[in-house]
Curated annotation (Swiss-Prot):
Record-linked InterPro entries: adnlytase_SelO, SelO
Cofactor list: Mg(2+); Mn(2+)
Protein name listed in UniProt: Protein nucleotidyltransferase YdiU
Native source organism of the sequence: Klebsiella pneumoniae subsp. pneumoniae (strain ATCC 700721 / MGH 78578)
Enzyme class: transferase
Amino acid sequence: MTLSFTTHWRDELPDFYTSLSPTPLDNARLIWRNAPLAQQLGVPDALFAPESGAGVWGGEALLPGMSPLAQVYSGHQFGAWAGQLGDGRGILLGEQQLADGRRYDWHLKGAGLTPYSRMGDGRAVLRSTIRESLASEAMHALGIPTTRALAMVTSDTPVYRERVEPGAMLMRVAESHVRFGHFEHFYYRREPQKVQQLADYVIRHHWPQLQDEADKYLLWFRDIVMRTAQTIASWQTVGFAHGVMNTDNMSILGLTIDYGPYGFLDDFQPDFICNHSDYQGRYSFENQPAVGLWNLQRLAQSLSPFISAEALNAALDEYQHALLTAYGQRMRDKLGLFSQQKGDNDLLDGLFALMIREKSDYTRTFRLLSHSEQLSAASPLRDEFIDRAAFDSWFAGYRARLRDEQVDDAQRQQRMQGVNPALVLRNWLAQRAIEQAEAGDMGELERLHAALADPFTDREDDYVRRPPDWGKRLEVSCSS
């Protein structure tokens, strides 16, 4: 099969990029490929063959139709205007056109210096590349909108961070890499016509159903608000903390993008901060919904030259309701509740209060709860709590609520076990795979990827056990 690549961004937005080719790594070699995604995209096996070398995956070759470029954008970082940013180490190689009309960017991360590298070296390290590959595929398996990882190479190129690490590249695939920061860039340069040009481009290619609407810009922005609310509600439901929700890391399509110092909750701590560079806790787990709105407000400001302030504010006012509605439905699913009743929030808050007090594991708590039976006062979750009396009191109220549902255990458990994962990507699991990969053993990386692709199946291995003490103390930062 021949892959088809288009150049819409290059052809339609000439002021939004710089043309350049990747800078290959020393002795680059393919260490992982996403076989299911490759099949979905029609990528021939020959491109992954050992005799092909690193090829396109290592920036050593381009496929027919590719025309590489680095995109320019700006953004707010940790609440402050950061000015021009852009693809500092990533290069958009091309836009793959599928037969069904869908189009996917092929974006090579760690591809070398670009005009937007600022003080960086244009490289990515094996550690962060593995973390992104694992996280994006884990989130996809959980049903959360995300960029995807197609292939990964390591190399003999030394990259200097807190320590010397091997350089690596990741082929990231997404329907679009347009960020809030793309619009901010030209707004702050006082070029509103280019902001509108980009809006027209995005609507034309990603919201074509809106093109003939009189108020297409407002309808488009409202959908961005809804997508952002839905995605962040999903994060909160599975206990995912992004860690660096700058406006340049916010996808216009509502995708989870730019996996850096992320983390999944171990103990349930609403104020969990996964990024040790986030000294003020701006991007803590519990702050993510509010930050999402703040970022949307920055996007709204950039769109103000052609959408009225009144209309933008009305759309922004829909965010909280959309997020709370989505979150509430997902949490009722996690509790096995098929209907909505007035006391449901109190029931959930009561469980959360217990979990905070006992430092209960977020993922294990809900997974074990999904095995509980309505008619039994015993629950596999009970042994997780020291204060059994407090748990018994909460569980009695929960069982009473289940009796109102008139749904049998099998049906309820099936729903709960389909939304409460047995396995999430804990940082200690990623770290173990990284350490073995840095030593030349890719076996654990492959095993972990395979496990994360099936997160809702009960397991007996150590992927689902409580994290070791050292695993809870792991520090991750923006260094990658």
